[in-house]
């Protein structure tokens, strides 16, 4: 998610104040630091495209040295899904554009199936060209070590946390500039629930609200909280926030991918839930290849405009891919290898 420092309107300015001290990890209770968010902007809100020369378009490795505990890339990616809120525990329905109702269980099955089958796929294989063992400024991993791998079954756990989502998220969508960031704190609770994994992304998903969190400014983000464990060792907790995607105001759903690929919905959720696989796929890919962000320094793979592998292909040629016997809407991901060979860096397989 490209970090935006030049803000578009005053409302976005309130959301973009992102460095804050907060409560620490659930395992230790010590203080932590929430680092700047990498936002995925809705269609039509993305920054201008990058220049077209090869050097300026390739992702560049930034050294993996962004503070204590930095890893550069996730070499063995893992994902934990957290459905946070009483609504998920109780169940609810959401309406498609034609009024047809879909259950929250159907949505959860769609998301779980996507994340549960992306590991080992050609789509996730795009990331295996990147590593953490090359010099800063490198645009390839020739001679590198610490490559991103593509294991199957990257979904390591699913948790429905029935505790209520705080009202400052539900009503305002400004949690990310509060002293005690509730999203980061929920990620820390998830780490306590599942166990800590430096190669994992903890994905926090909130239920529908009258005013969707953070929307219509952005569709999601990934970031990390830097904390201290019980032995005094610094560690990074990588997490992504996926607010409710299907709220229909003002044009929100289409802005984040509602029916972006599939005009008609089916019983599995294609169409009505297109946005969920597009946005989660975007955040997952960026968290794997550019996980560190210590005090605004992105030390993984991003280009000279700080755009990551998802940003560079956002809303370009979105399409279905087959995973686990189902179709899922996704955006392409950036491939240095493909760009250098063909001039087209936005691909859906490797």
What does each model-identified segment do?
Residues 27-174, 178, 182:
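N-terminal carbohydrate-binding/catalytic regions of secreted carbohydrate-active enzymes
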Residues 9-18:
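Bacterial N-terminal signal peptides
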Residues 142-229:
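Active-site-proximal segments of metallohydrolase catalytic domains
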Residues 217-274, 290-350:
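Metalloprotease/metallohydrolase-associated module, dominated by Zn2+-dependent proteases
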Residues 75-80, 123, 197-202, 235-238, ...:
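Loop/turn elements at helix/coil->beta-strand transitions in domains of secreted/extracellular proteins
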Residues 278-290:
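Active-site recognition of the HExxH zinc-binding catalytic motif
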Residues 19-25:
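Sec/Tat signal peptide C-region and signal peptidase I cleavage site
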Residues 1-8:
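Bacterial N-terminal signal peptides that target proteins for export
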């Amino acid at each position: 998610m490209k970090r935006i420092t030049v803000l578009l309107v005053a409302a976005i300015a309130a959301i973009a104040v992102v460095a804050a001290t907060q409560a620490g990890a659930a395992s230790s209770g010590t203080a932590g630091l929430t680092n700047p968010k990498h936002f995925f902007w809705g269609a039509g809100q993305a920054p201008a495209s990058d220049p077209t020369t090869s050097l300026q378009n390739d992702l560049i490795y930034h050294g993996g040295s962004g503070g204590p505990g930095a890893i550069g890339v996730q070499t063995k990616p893992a994902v934990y899904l957290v459905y946070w809120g009483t609504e998920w525990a109780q169940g609810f329905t959401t309406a498609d554009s034609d009024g047809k109702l879909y259950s929250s269980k159907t949505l959860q099955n769609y998301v779980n199936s996507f994340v549960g089958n992306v590991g080992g796929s050609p789509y996730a294989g795009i990331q295996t060209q990147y590593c953490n063992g090359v010099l800063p400024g490198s645009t390839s991993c020739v001679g590198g070590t610490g490559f991103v791998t593509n294991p199957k079954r990257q979904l390591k756990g699913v948790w429905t946390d029935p505790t209520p989502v705080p009202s400052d998220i539900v009503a305002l969508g400004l949690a990310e500039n509060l002293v005690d960031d509730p999203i980061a704190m929920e990620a820390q609770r998830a780490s306590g629930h599942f166990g800590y994994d430096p190669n994992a992304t903890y994905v926090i998903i909130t239920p529908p609200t009258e005013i969707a969190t953070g929307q219509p400014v952005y569709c999601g983000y990934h970031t990390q909280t830097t904390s201290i464990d019980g032995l005094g060792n610094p560690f990074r907790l990588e997490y992504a926030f996926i607010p409710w995607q299907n709220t229909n105001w003002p044009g929100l759903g289409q802005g984040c991918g509602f029916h972006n690929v599939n005009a008609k919905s089916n019983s599995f959720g294609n169409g009505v839930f297109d946005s969920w696989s597009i946005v989660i796929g975007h955040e997952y890919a960026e968290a794997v290849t550019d996980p560190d962000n210590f005090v605004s320094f992105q030390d993984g793979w991003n280009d000279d405009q700080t755009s990551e592998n998802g940003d560079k292909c956002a809303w370009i040629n979105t399409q279905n891919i087959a995973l686990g016997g189902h179709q899922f809407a996704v955006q392409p991901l950036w491939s240095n290898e493909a760009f250098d060979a063909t001039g087209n860096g936005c691909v859906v397989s490797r």
